């Protein structure tokens, strides 16, 4: 077979590709106003949709584990066995306490109590943000601020609904494996409330874990003193005195430390730039979909026209 014969199919293929491209560009040119019109409609629609979306702001606090360890160090290792037998907690290590605090921060009980104590039902379910005035307002169709009455069909939202609503806007990250850094953030349409709630959450979790530890230590001290009075063994009395000392240290530490579990490295500040929605992305996606759809319609119209012409 000669080389000229081998080149013939390739030449025909190139010519067919060139014809197909010319035909495609011809179709696009013939349907240019349709393509422009459909794409423009989608572009305008995506712009309107993007502008109608509520701005969401992110307030974030950066936290580190409190410096002082609640564990008793060498004393803890010496008395760990005796404390375990007596059911006495010598104080969680830093890592364990952080894990407990994060789990508590996400818990249904803690969040429910936080919402109730800070009266967050109204802003959580009826709150809105007025861009023109830069202030939070209440939706009068959901809550009557004058009479204090909920206008929803079932009245005030339930605790479960409040927990789910708050969990959706709450984000807890960490701890970082290297630094132990933890972040607490809230994404919310009201930037003032977002920053306020984050800072209150940090204070609340520190106070909550402190209260738990003090309560456990106080109960342990009372129990150990009772056991001390009942034993005559000198060695056991020495152990009880050391355990009482360890529990007393916990209560004293709690008295002098406000930042009991988390030390605030960077408190939440009022954000001035929204994180959502990403309006430019919405518009670009809208234009892309409009352009793609217009091409499909144009090709379908041309194909239908050719089919009818052949018939």
Walk through the language-model features, giving the residues of each:
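Disulfide- and glycan-decorated extracellular loop modules of small multi-pass membrane proteins
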Residues: 235-241
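Short, low-order "capping/linker" segments at domain edges
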Residues: 223-234
């Amino acid at each position: 077979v000669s080389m000229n014969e081998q080149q013939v199919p390739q030449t025909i293929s190139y010519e067919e590709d060139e014809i197909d491209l010319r035909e495609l560009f011809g179709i696009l040119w013939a349907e240019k106003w349709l393509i422009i019109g459909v794409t423009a409609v989608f572009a305008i629609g995506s712009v309107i949709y993007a502008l109608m979306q509520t701005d969401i702001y992110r307030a974030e606090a950066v936290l580190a584990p409190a410096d002082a360890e609640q564990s008793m160090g060498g004393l803890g290792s010496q008395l760990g066995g005796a404390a375990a037998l007596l059911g006495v907690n010598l104080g969680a290590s830093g890592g364990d306490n952080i894990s407990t605090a994060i789990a508590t921060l996400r818990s249904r009980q803690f969040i429910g109590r936080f919402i109730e104590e800070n009266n967050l039902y109204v802003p959580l379910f009826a709150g809105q943000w007025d861009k023109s005035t830069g202030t939070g307002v209440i939706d009068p169709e959901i809550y009557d601020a004058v009479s204090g009455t909920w206008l929803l069909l079932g009245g005030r939202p339930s605790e479960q609904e409040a927990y789910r609503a708050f969990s959706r806007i709450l984000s807890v990250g960490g701890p970082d494996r290297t630094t132990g850094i933890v972040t607490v953030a809230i994404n919310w349409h009201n930037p003032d409330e977002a920053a306020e709630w984050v800072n209150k959450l940090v204070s609340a979790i520190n106070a909550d874990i402190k209260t738990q530890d003090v309560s456990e230590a106080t109960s342990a001290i009372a129990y150990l003193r009772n056991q001390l009075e009942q034993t005559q063994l000198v060695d056991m009395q020495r152990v009880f005195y050391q355990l009482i000392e360890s529990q007393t240290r916990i209560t004293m530490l709690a008295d002098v430390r406000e930042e009991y579990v988390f030390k605030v490295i960077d408190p939440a500040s009022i954000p001035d730039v929204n994180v959502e929605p990403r309006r430019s992305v919405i518009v670009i996606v809208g234009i892309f979909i409009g352009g793609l759809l217009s091409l499909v319609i144009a090709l379908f119209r041309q194909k239908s026209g050719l089919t009818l012409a052949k018939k």
